[in-house]
């Protein structure tokens, strides 16, 4: 329990930030899930649209400080690689 007014305020602010960050993280997870589902279906157009959306969502999370920029970059890279795999297999 906070003993001072400033500690109470810090607690309120932390709760607001946490709620906001959880919402952003949930959006990232949802975008990644949609992309993985699109990859599983094998439709290139849907996959590209989902990849673009996921990249945008992850980039925004990194810019807001919810994700570290290197973690966001790594996640985008791995998702792009996974999205390109079925297209490369179909081209052979």
From Swiss-Prot:
One of its GO terms (molecular function) is small ribosomal subunit rRNA binding. Gene3D superfamilies: Ribosomal protein S20. GO terms for cellular component: cytosol; small ribosomal subunit. It holds the Pfam family Ribosomal_S20p. GO terms for biological process: translation. Keywords: Ribonucleoprotein, Ribosomal protein, RNA-binding, rRNA-binding. The keyword Glycoprotein does not apply. Residues 1-28 are annotated as: Disordered. InterPro entries: Ribosomal_bS20 (IPR002583), Ribosomal_bS20_sf (IPR036510). It comes from the Bacteria. Binds directly to 16S ribosomal RNA. Belongs to the bacterial ribosomal protein bS20 family. PANTHER family: 30S RIBOSOMAL PROTEIN S20, SMALL RIBOSOMAL SUBUNIT PROTEIN BS20C. NCBIfam families: S20. This is Small ribosomal subunit protein bS20. It comes from Anaeromyxobacter dehalogenans (strain 2CP-C). The lineage of its organism: Bacteria, Pseudomonadati, Myxococcota, Myxococcia, Myxococcales.
């Amino acid at each position: 329990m906070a003993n001072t007014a400033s500690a109470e305020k810090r607690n309120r602010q932390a709760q607001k930030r946490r709620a906001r960050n959880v919402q952003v993280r949930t959006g990232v997870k949802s975008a990644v899930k949609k992309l993985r589902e699109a990859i599983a279906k094998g439709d290139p157009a849907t996959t590209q649209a989902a990849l673009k959306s996921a990249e945008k969502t992850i980039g925004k999370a990194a810019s807001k400080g919810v994700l570290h920029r290197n973690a966001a970059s790594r996640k985008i890279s791995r998702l792009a690689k996974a999205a390109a795999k079925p297209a490369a297999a179909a081209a052979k």
